Amino acid sequence: MTSGAGWEEQVFLPITNSISSEDNNQIKIGSSVSIEYNQNGQHVSQIDDKGLHNILVLTGYAIDESTGELVPTFDPCDYVKGILISGKILKGNHFKIIGIPSNKLYIIRKKDVHGNITFSLPIKNFNTGTYQVDLRDKVTSFVSLDRDVAKTIVDNVLAKIYAKIYNSLNKEQKDKLYRDVEEIFNYYSIKSLKSNP
């Protein structure tokens, strides 16, 4: 944490089937979102020898897996889980939340989170200055990560974001991290009921 006042600016990185690592400290989500992370930054979400901590759950949202953008559904049962990392959104629209008290966020596996947090969300497109979401002919569905996807996310994404800590983990601790990702991360995906959305 920085100077007791709050965290440096964070980005919400949804952990989904459509996430992949790029060169130059970048993560790609679907076709429309690219996030640059600060490898030496102070991430709200952390890993250690006991696993993954400070996972943010955004309720009332689903993810468009083709684009990687979050879509507000206004359904309290829909949610997307992800991590808060030091970085910025390079490609895609974003919505910035400034200085929200950490105790107002739905954070699971909480560890050492205090103060205010400013973060950005990769969100569905804006139209001419007005935020508009068309939920007609759309349906959300529950998605969980399988073991192979969880392993790929740990090896190709988390291992790069948290390189110093990850490289110090032994095999048993890395196996725990694989299990954490597989068991913790699930989400709702939004799709069109029409064949050509």
Swiss-Prot record:
GO CC terms, sorted: cytoplasm
GO biological process, one term: CRISPR-cas system
Record keyword Cytoplasm present: yes
Main location as per UniProt: cytoplasm
Protein keywords: Antiviral defense, Cytoplasm
Domain of life: Archaea
Entries under InterPro entries matching the protein: Cmr7A, CRISPR_Cmr7_comp
Membership in a protein family: Belongs to the CRISPR system Cmr7 family.
Quaternary context: Possible homodimer. Part of the CMR ribonucleoprotein complex, consisting of crRNA plus Cmr1/Cmr2/Cmr3/Cmr4/Cmr5/Cmr6 at 1:1 and possibly 3 Cmr7 dimers. A Cmr2/Cmr3/Cmr7 subcomplex without crRNA can also be isolated. It does not cleave target RNA.
Protein name as catalogued: CRISPR system CMR subunit Cmr7 1
Native source organism of the sequence: Saccharolobus solfataricus (strain ATCC 35092 / DSM 1617 / JCM 11322 / P2) (Sulfolobus solfataricus)
Organism lineage string: Archaea, Thermoproteota, Thermoprotei, Sulfolobales, Sulfolobaceae
Gene designation per UniProt: cmr7A
